[in-house]
Regions:
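Active-site-adjacent bridging/hinge elements
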Residues: 38-47, 264-275
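AAA+ P-loop ATPase catalytic core
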Residues: 66-73, 269-272, 290-302, 322
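Extended, charged/polar low-complexity intrinsically disordered regions
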Residues: 1-51
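Structural recognition of short helix-loop-helix hairpins that underlie histone-fold modules
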Residues: 55-56, 258-262, 273-282
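The conserved phosphate-sensing helix
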Residues: 60-64, 183, 262-263, 284-299, ...
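Conserved ASCE/P-loop NTPase catalytic core
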Residues: 32, 36-39, 44-255, 369-383
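Short amphipathic alpha-helical segments embedded in low-complexity Lys/Glu-rich regions
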Residues: 15, 67-70, 80-86, 113-116, ...
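C-terminal engagement/docking regions of AAA+ P-loop ATPases
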Residues: 94, 269, 278-290, 303-384
Length: 384
């Protein structure tokens, strides 16, 4: 037959055989039970803090990036690509490289290998398809690194692949070109001031629009200094609540789990999407694809929280992530999302963080109600 046959990965086959029942590591079960009576965001936040080691980055720092990594890893089918922007991405880069090991087929981009499949000849001279890096990273992650270091042709190819959600295989002598869904998540970084990034990456706005998860990563100097001082200690011990192996097992099981969205969750996401577009004039800062991204983020948050149904709080987590990224990108927010800046791991799940998320939920609901009165019904029908 022409083209390549899509083989179902082992994890979804396991889901079918076990009827969706999870076989969770003991550390995950104990942590989930301990968090069950707390905030609906606590368990996922603690999981995010467990990414990497304390040598990569302080566990209380870069929470927005940590959540973005988890959201990307906890999706299947149309994957959530991740773009990290900042003036100093040393700690972010360490965290990304460490998180790569949580997925199958982790791949770091090399300019020596084609991005997608190319036509080649085998030793006998017969035509064949040579897998590119997107195919080799199937079911995993392709870490592109610095966008500024990529050739213009590769950047355009990346934009096309992410926007269409598919990779194209070249035509064989007797077979037409074929397409397959993109099965790898793409991670990339853009480092420098906004002026430098605009100069080095002419189409950075296009990348921000098509990459579902955009994180503006900034770490204050005091956090970096403390990290450098403490990480140099020879006797530094790291005792994560969930080991690296257990976290990998959890992600591998939950990302193929089917999640249904409750009406309240879908209504919140749709209302937030419409309100965000209307409150920003032309709406160009919030692309049409944003709603699909919000839905997938809510589903990913529900999976990570071990729920098979995405509830309203999962939608709030998705809206908060998106609004935080949008505020950093355009310089303002109508909702004033609480900043992810913590001085300790306890702050991530403390009462203040819980109250901040509850306040954001209320602000979000009020904005949706206010702007929904001025939203034409035709606009709602077009996206539902």
């Amino acid at each position: 037959m022409c083209g390549l046959e899509q083989v179902k990965p082992a994890a979804p086959r396991h889901q079918e055989l076990t009827n969706g029942q999870l076989q969770l590591p003991g550390s995950v079960v104990r942590l989930h039970q301990a968090c069950n009576s707390n905030s609906p965001y606590t368990f996922v936040r603690i999981l995010a803090s467990q990414l990497g080691s304390v040598l990569d980055a302080p566990r209380h720092a870069l929470l927005q990036l940590r959540l973005g990594i988890l959201f990307s890893l906890a999706t299947h089918g149309p994957r959530l690509p991740l773009l990290v922007i900042g003036t100093d991405l040393v700690l972010a880069h360490r965290l990304l490289r460490s998180a790569l090991q949580l997925c199958p087929n982790p791949t770091v981009y090399s300019h020596l290998i084609p991005l997608s499949a190319v036509l080649a000849r085998d030793t006998s001279g017969a035509h064949c398809l040579q897998a590119g890096q997107l195919q080799r990273a199937e079911d995993g992650v392709l870490y592109l690194g610095q966008l500024a270091a990529l050739k213009s042709s590769v950047k355009q190819q990346v934009l096309s692949v992410v926007e269409t959600g598919a990779t194209t295989f070249p035509a064989l002598p007797r077979c037409p070109p074929t397409q397959q869904p993109l099965a790898a998540a793409l991670w990339a970084t853009a480092e420098g001031s906004s002026t430098v990034i605009q100069k080095n990456i002419k189409d950075i706005e296009s990348f921000c629009n098509v990459f579902g998860l955009v994180v503006h990563s900034e770490v204050d100097d005091e956090t970096v200094m403390q990290h450098c001082l403490f990480s140099s200690y020879d006797d530094l011990h790291d005792s994560p609540k969930v080991s690296f192996e257990d976290l990998a097992r959890l992600i591998d099981q939950v990302r193929y789990r089917k999640v249904t969205l409750t009406e309240s969750c879908r209504s919140l996401l749709t209302g937030y999407f419409l309100a965000s577009r209307r409150s920003r004039g032309s709406g160009s800062e919030v692309p049409q694809t944003a709603l699909a991204t919000l839905l997938r983020m809510a589903e990913a948050h529900a999976r990570l929280a071990l729920r098979q149904e995405a509830v309203e709080e999962d939608g709030v987590a998705a809206c908060h992530f998106y609004e935080t990224s949008l505020a950093a990108q355009v310089g303002y927010s109508h909702l004033e999302p609480p900043a992810f800046s913590f001085s300790s791991l306890g702050d991530i799940v403390g009462d203040v963080a819980k109250e901040d998320m509850e306040m954001f939920h209320r602000y979000c609901s009020v904005m949706i109600i206010m702007l929904s009165k001025h939203t034409p019904s035709s606009e709602v029908l077009n996206i539902t």
